[in-house]
Each structure stands twice: as structure tokens, then as C-alpha cells.
Amino acid sequence: YKGEVIYDKAFGLLMPSREGHRQMVETGSLYDLASITKAAATTPAMMLLVAEKKVRLDAPLLTYLPETRESLLGMVTIRQLLLHESGLPAGINFYTDLIDDSSYEGALIRSKSFAGGVRLVGRAWGNPNFQFKGDFIADQPSKTHTLTFGHRRYLSPSFKQVLLDRLFSARVSSNKSYRYSDLNFLLLQE
């Protein structure tokens, strides 16, 4: 407050290490914020829009995104999106829309190691012989590939519509109990 720390405490335990040890959280503990950005940026923006009466928490999504009118997604409320009670799946593998299926043989991802395969995470092995679709990914920036996607990889802004089309057609469960979903915040950003 006014340049002074007024509360500096730490609680809980960190995730177990590979050796299985759990360490107490300290005030100097570091965290990976990779996935929290969506919530940390979107939630305050939504709070501001609600305070300005530009968004109503209990309004269905179709109020703000008419393209959701024809699906169950249109009936999901802003409140349900914020509380992860939308019925949306945890995520969608959008990367599959970026990869040219004809550029590799066999499966893209397998559950067992195979000759030439690259270990991804856990028991997942990837086929490194794939190519990205040129419509969406390029090795050099250009008028059509303006967004930095990775090291020497540039994404076309046109991919956003592919992402939104997949999102708008996602299956919405009638079970509205808590289930974390990255998709909620992607929708709220729209």
C-alpha cells in the first residue's frame, strides 16, 4: 500500500519434486505463469465491463457473440464462463488445424516410442516429419504471416477464424459443474 508491503506471508506446499519431496511455499517461491495470463488479463477486463454496465454476468453469450446463436454455446452465460461452469471441454487441440496431414506417414502422436519419434511428455511420442500448412505458418514474416508464433515461425491472422469456428462448434455438456477450460477465457476475450 502506497509503496509498502502490508502483508507478506506464504502458505501451502509446492508440487512434489521428481524425488517425491514436497517443499513449503516461501514468499520468494517462483511460479510458472504460462496459463494464468488468460485469467489474469481477462477477469479484470470483464470486471470493468460489468462495472461500466457494458456486460451483464447473467446474459447469454449470444447477446455478445451472435454467431453462437445456433448452438448450445449461445445459451452459456458470462458468469458460467468466468466460473468454469460452461460445460465446455477442457481444451481443443488447435494445433491439428495448423499441420498438413499429408506431410507425414502414420500417426502424428503415439502412446509408445517408435523409430524416429520424439518424446513429448509422459508417454506421448511425436512424429517429427510433419509440415505446417503454408496458409497459416511461414518461416519468414510477410504481409500474410504477421504474428510471431515461435522461433522463425510466423502465423497468419486468418487462423483466428479457424480457431473461432472450432470453438463455436465445440460440444457443450449439459453438466454445468466446475470443469477448468481454457476455452472459457478465449470466448470472453472475444
Give residue spans per PLM region.
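Short, glycine-anchored, charge-dense loop/turn motifs used at functional sites
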Residues: 1-6
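Residue-level detector of high-confidence beta-strand sites
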Residues: 8-10
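Active-site-proximal loop and beta-strand segments within enzyme catalytic domains
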Residues: 12-180
